[in-house]
């Protein structure tokens, strides 16, 4: 199997196994699907702590308003009585005004948080360090875990406007958000290797040959952004090792310089001409009047 180290810019994303015979069209779709699904898991995991601490999301027309403004405008959250967490709610006001403040109890909070950590671990970049390749099945498992935890805590479900439910049902609207800049659709996705675009319509072996044991770095980006920056000749870890070696060498030279004692150069035994003068009888000669 060919192992691909997928990056976005200079940031590592995940490892992916494929074959040299794969069509670039298929490969792009597979990598793009995993890349975007991992982003979805991250977005849900970002909202889970808010759900655990402050309950369900308020309707859009009530978000950001003070209690007085809500009363004055005669607004009411119709989902508050429908979406009650298992075991009852504990009130904790959301200072931002996005959620209604009726949070789950500690036991249910623990279910949400524990599941969130398990889901994050499945698609974590630490998998790359452990040389574990990510598959779409792994990402789907993470999404299923999150969906299951939400159903346990909220048996009646979440409001249709809650960002977690919208993400789970693929109804999210990321327009105008920072998250939208990270998403890459299959139509606009490009794969690059060694500053070469991997063109759809060709196979991977057209670029890297037929060796199935190849390991390469592939970069994913949006069409029209030009060639991504080349990979540095020396990796970040190798650079750190070189700097450490250089520093240690400098310290060793400094210690040798400090320990360098040349007073012995005045000694008789260090005189290269002493033996010659001894054979010629020129030792112990005193100059000047006696």
Swiss-Prot record:
The entry's keywords: Cell projection, Cilium, Cytoplasm, Cytoskeleton
One BP annotation, GO: pronephros development
Compartments where located: Cytoplasm; Cytoplasm, Cytoskeleton, Cilium basal body
Keyword Ribosomal protein: no
Consequences of knocking out this gene: Larval lethal. Animals show strong ciliopathy phenotypes, including pronephric cysts, axis curvature, left-right asymmetry defects and hydrocephalus. Kidney tubules are dilated and polarity of cilia in the epithelium is disorganized. Cilia length and number appear normal, but outer dynein arms are missing and cilia are paralyzed. Morpholino knockdown of the protein results in similar phenotypes.
Pfam families, per the entry: CFAP298
Coiled-coil ranges per UniProt: none
Keyword RNA-binding carried by entry: no
Expression by tissue: Strongly expressed in ciliated tissues of the embryonic trunk, including the pronephric ducts and spinal canal.
One term under GO cellular component: cytoplasm
InterPro entries: CFAP298
Function text: Plays a role in motile cilium function, possibly by acting on outer dynein arm assembly. Seems to be important for initiation rather than maintenance of cilium motility. Required for correct positioning of cilia at the apical cell surface, suggesting an additional role in the planar cell polarity (PCP) pathway. May suppress canonical Wnt signaling activity.
Subunit structure and binding partners: Interacts with dnaaf1/swt. Interacts with lrrc6/sea. Interacts with dvl (via DEP and PDZ domains).
Family: Belongs to the CFAP298 family.
Name of the protein: Cilia- and flagella-associated protein 298
Organism: Danio rerio
Gene of this entry: cfap298
